[in-house]
Amino acid sequence: MTKIDTQDLLWQNISELPYFRGFLRSIEGRYFRELNLQGEVLDLGCGDGHLTSKTLPDSKVQGIDPAFFSLRAAKRLNYFSGLVCSDGDKLPYQKSSFNTIISNSVLEHIPDVDSVIHEVVRILRKGGKFIISVPNNNFTKNLSIAIFFERLGMVRIANSYRRMFNWISRHHHPDPEERWLGRLRDQGLTIKDEWNYFPPEYLKILEWGHVFGLPSWINFKLFGRWILNPSPANYLLKRIYYWLHPFFNGEAKSANGAYTFIVAEKQ
C-alpha cells in the first residue's frame, strides 16, 4: 500500500473535511498550486480559509466573505494577511488593487453573479488574473441516482432528484461551460486557459458522500470538528485515503467533468 504522505493535498483535506468534499478540494487545490501564483492574492469567498491555507501556504492572501461565522474560523488559522466581511457585488477595495483574484466553488451560489464579476474586473489590475472553479451542467446531468431513475423510465423522479441535489448544494448556476466563459468575456476578460474536471466516476464519490459522510456532519455539530482523530492512526481515515489515492493521482481532467476551471485575464 502507498505510504500516507501527511503533507500531500489529499491527506490534508480529507483529514479535516468530510471525505467527499476533501477529495474535490484536493484536486482543485492542486490546480491552483500548479499556477505558481505570484504577489498578493484575494480569495473571493474564502469561507473558513481551509482550501487556500492548505493550497498556497507561502502566498500572501487576503480573504473576503459575507459570512462572519466563516471568517471567525479563517481568522483562527493566522494565515490571511487581511480578512473582510462583505458581499461580492460591493467589494471594499480601490480600483486596480490586485494582481490575482481566486474564487473556488463560490460563484455558483450567487444569484446575481454578473454584478460580482463586474466588481472583480474593477479591482483587478491590467494583466491580472481571475481564476475560478465552478460546477457546470455535467454536474446535474451525471448524478448517478438520476441516471438510474432515467434508465427505469422515471424521468420526472430523476429530474426532481437533480433539483433536490442542486438545492442541497445551494447551486444557483450549475451552468454550461460556455455560459461561464461568456460571463467572463462579457465583462471584458480574456480566457487564457480552461478545462473541465471531475468525471462521472469522481462525481459518484461526491454524490454518495453526502449520505456516507453523515457521521462527519454529526461530529461538526457536536464538537465543531469534521474529523475527531485526524491522524494516520485513524483506521477508517487511513482506508479512505488508500481508496481515494488512485483517483487523486489519476487524470481528473475530462470533457465530461462536472466542474470547470478557468483562468481569465484583464486586458
Descriptions of predicted regions:
Residues D114-E119, K129-I262:
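S-adenosyl-L-methionine-dependent methyltransferase catalytic module, highlighting the catalytic core
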